[in-house]
């Protein structure tokens, strides 16, 4: 198979959560408590020197707004919809924007979905579930 000729999916959605991991190496890292472990446990202990990452997430939202893509902020991250290339470019730009704010290490967790049988938005998926729940409660 010629893998170079494989096109990316026409449309996709991605849920991602960008975590600014550290602006500088935290003092506890030198005490043998590796930064990676802290980054994986609790957002309050991720080493940015500030328990709030709201300003960094606000910057991500500004990047997404400028992208023109459909996106939805939720409590655990953001859902972004568009072509594969557009969505991945937007996530990359979000990383770059947060790096420009002085964050030297960023980790994003992403869950990506794509369909080839029909067009379906994240909103369509939610509406379908709400419809099922409403019909079951009657």
Tell me the role of every PLM-derived stretch:
Residues 1-138:
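Charge-rich, low-complexity N-terminal segments
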């Amino acid at each position: 198979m010629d893998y170079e000729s494989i096109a990316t999916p026409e449309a996709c959605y991605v849920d991602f959560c960008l975590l600014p991991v550290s602006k500088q190496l935290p003092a506890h890292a030198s005490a043998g408590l590796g930064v990676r472990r802290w980054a994986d446990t609790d957002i309050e202990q991720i080493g940015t020197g500030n328990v709030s990452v709201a300003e960094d997430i606000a910057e991500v939202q500004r990047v997404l707004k400028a992208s023109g893509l459909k996106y939805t902020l939720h409590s655990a991250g953001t859902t972004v919809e568009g072509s594969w290339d557009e969505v991945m470019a937007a996530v990359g730009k979000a990383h770059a924007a947060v790096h420009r704010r002085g964050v030297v290490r960023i980790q994003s967790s992403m869950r990506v979905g794509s369909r080839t049988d029909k067009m379906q938005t994240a909103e369509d998926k939610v509406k379908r579930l709400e419809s099922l729940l409403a019909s079951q409660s009657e």
